Structure formats: structure tokens, C-alpha cells
């Protein structure tokens, strides 16, 4: 699936050992890109990276994204064509326990990316992944548009709003940053995610131990999207704006309205796939989390020719296959399944 645009492009991905970073880096390798990873050494969600043995595909340098010198030194060695910033403290609930680290990783880390491209020769384009939780959420069932106010009622969400504001401020302050695009995506699922307090990973962890999953907010609505959809959208954005000059924009990356679904429905679909009657218990959490989150993706869809999504049951079934192979400890089959699936997905794009 070598892609003419991506062939031999030098791409830095920060946070490459995490769930999304691992999938994205593998897709880019299969597309012909030269990938260079920068990641924190301690990562509790690097199982996909290890299972697919991605260290054999490209080199990862380990450092601290909240330390300017750590990333700047790495960047100067690579001199990338493209920079993708994904490194973050990615958990809402964890931000209550480690608020300062969340701010350091998500805000100062983003500032270090921007400062690095300011003081060095900038890449042609920098893609900064923030989150769909970057908006001020008043639970009004509205679909958030890119022009809506940024903010957050928890430290994680606020940190992503701050990262967006920083990107805009840097762009307006300096003229030598190349092209910068921020993308706001979230509730991404797929095989290989073992993150904390995430619905779908928790489901598979629980049923593998023959235990019920604990659901905090069964009626919460989220914009669920399969891992390869945002990745393909990220690639489309980079390809389109690569040759611009000092361009800035931001996009919501989200699914169609049919995939804005209640938490409990997701679990019931997975139970049906696994022929289970009821795998869950409901226990309310005391910690605050938005109940309703909906994204308006019309800005992106009006600019790009977007592949129509299959129904969410299809993607949950694919996700189920990945975890089934994982818990059967069939590593060779996981590798074959993942690579063949990526090739098939992009062939149909």
C-alpha cells in the first residue's frame, strides 16, 4: 500500500508507543514513510506497540515532552518533513490525581513542540492532536463546532483547550512555523487499547477474567469512531495542506450522527457479538465527567471527500476479533490480522 505522497517522507510522531500513536505509525510505515518516534519511557498503554513489535520497524527515542531540551535535541537530529504531536496525559479521571503532570504534558508539552519549530527550521506541516473534550461543555446536547468556546470542567479537558489556544497564539505571533493544523478527536476505539477507565478496553479486560464490567455513566453519549477513521482523516489533512505556506486551521474529526451513541448501547452490542446475556454492573462515579459530547464534523466533510462509515457494529466486531486473538495469545495471527486489515481499509478508501 505504498503511497506516492508518503513515500520516504520523514515523519516524527510524539507519543508513538501509545494506542493511537502505534496504529498511526504502523499505517505510515506501510505507506512508505520514514517514521521516527519520541515517547515517554514509562507507558502503561504500549501493548499494541509491543505486540506488533513496532520497534523492529523504526527507531523510538525516549524522553520527556515537557522538557524543551529533551525534544529539541531529538528534533534537530531528524529534521522532519512532517511532525505529528500526539504525546499527552490522555485520561480524564487520572487528571484528578495528577493535575500538574497533566498540565505539564498537555500544555507545556505542546508549547515545547511549537517553540522547537520556531527556533529551528520548521517542518512543512505540524499536526497537533488535541481532543474533542477541548470545548466548554454545558451538557446542552449541541454538536460542537470549531468556533465554539474552548475550556473544560476538569483538568484534562482544560489542558486540551489550553493547547488549542497556544497553537493559535503561536501562529498569530510568529511567521516561521510552517503550516499548523490542530485536530480535535476522541472516543477512538479499536484493537490494542488498554488505557485506564476506557469503556471498550475495560469490557475486554473484564470478560477475559469472566467478570462484569463496571459502567459509571450508562446514558452518557459519545462520538464513537474506529481507530482507522481519524488516522485516515489525519493523513488527508496533512496531504492537503502540506504545500501551503504559513497556514493555520483546526478541524473536528468525528463520526456521523448515527455513531453518537449511549455507553450502554455499546456494551449491549459487544455482548451480542460475544453471545453474552449481560456483562455489566452500573456504579455511579463521584468524579465529574461530561454526560453528553457531540461533534459537528461538517467543516471537515465539506472540504474533503470522506469515505462513508460502515455501521458501528461492524467496527466493534473487528475490534472484538483483535482482542479475541490477543487473549488467545496468538501473536502471529494478530500481526497478520492487523496488517491485512489496514491494507484492506485503505484500499477501500
Feature locations, PLM:
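N-terminal Rossmann-like NAD(P)+-binding domain of SDR-like oxidoreductases, especially those catalyzing
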Residues: 1-185, 337-341
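C-terminal substrate-binding subdomain of Rossmann-fold SDR/epimerase-dehydratase oxidoreductases
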Residues: 30-31, 63, 207-349
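Flexible, glycine-rich phosphate/dinucleotide-binding loops
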Residues: 43-44, 135, 189, 259, ...
Amino acid at each position: 500500500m505504498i503511497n506516492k505522497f508518503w513515500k520516504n517522507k520523514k515523519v516524527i510522531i510524539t507519543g508513538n508507543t501509545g494506542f493511537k500513536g502505534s496504529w498511526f505509525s504502523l499505517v505510515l510505515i506501510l505507506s512508505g514513510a520514514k517514521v521516527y518516534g519520541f515517547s515517554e519511557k514509562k507507558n502503561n498503554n504500549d501493548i499494541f506497540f509491543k505486540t506488533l513489535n513496532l520497534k523492529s520497524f523504526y527507531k523510538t527515542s525516549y524522553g520527556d515532552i515537557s522538557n524543551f531540551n529533551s525534544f529539541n535535541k531529538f528534533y534537530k537530529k531528524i529534521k522532519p518533513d512532517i511532525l505529528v504531536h500526539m504525546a499527552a496525559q490522555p485520561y480524564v479521571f487520572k487528571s484528578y490525581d495528577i493535575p500538574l503532570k497533566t498540565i505539564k504534558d498537555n500544555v507545556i508539552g505542546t508549547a515545547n513542540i511549537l517553540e522547537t519549530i520556531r527556533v529551528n527550521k520548521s517542518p512543512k506541516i505540524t499536526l497537533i492532536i488535541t481532543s474533542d473534550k477541548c470545548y466548554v461543555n454545558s451538557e446542552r446536547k449541541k454538536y460542537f463546532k470549531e468556533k465554539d468556546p474552548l475550556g473544560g470542567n476538569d483538568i484534562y479537558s482544560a489542558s486540551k483547550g489550553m493547547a488549542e489556544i497556544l497553537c493559535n497564539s503561536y501562529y498569530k505571533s510568529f511567521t516561521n512555523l510552517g503550516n499548523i493544523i490542530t485536530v480535535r478527536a476522541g472516543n477512538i476505539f479499536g484493537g490494542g487499547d488498554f488505557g485506564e477507565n476506557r469503556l471498550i478496553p475495560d469490557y475486554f479486560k473484564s470478560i477475559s477474567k469472566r467478570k462484569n464490567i463496571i459502567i459509571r455513566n450508562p446514558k452518557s453519549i459519545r462520538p464513537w469512531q474506529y481507530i482507522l477513521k481519524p488516522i485516515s482523516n489525519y493523513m488527508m489533512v496533512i496531504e492537503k495542506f502540506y504545500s501551503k505556506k504559513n497556514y493555520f486551521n483546526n478541524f473536528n474529526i468525528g463520526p456521523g450522527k448515527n455513531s453518537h451513541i449511549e455507553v450502554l448501547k455499546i456494551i449491549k452490542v459487544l455482548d451480542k457479538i460475544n453471545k453474552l446475556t449481560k456483562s455489566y454492573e452500573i456504579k455511579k462515579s463521584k468524579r465529574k465527567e461530561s454526560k453528553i459530547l457531540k461533534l459537528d464534523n461538517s467543516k471537515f466533510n465539506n472540504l474533503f471527500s470522506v469515505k462513508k462509515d460502515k455501521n458501528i457494529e461492524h467496527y466493534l466486531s473487528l475490534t472484538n476479533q483483535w482482542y479475541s486473538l490477543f487473549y488467545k495469545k496468538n501473536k502471529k495471527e494478530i500481526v497478520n490480522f492487523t496488517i491485512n486489515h489496514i491494507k484492506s481499509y485503505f484500499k477501500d478508501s
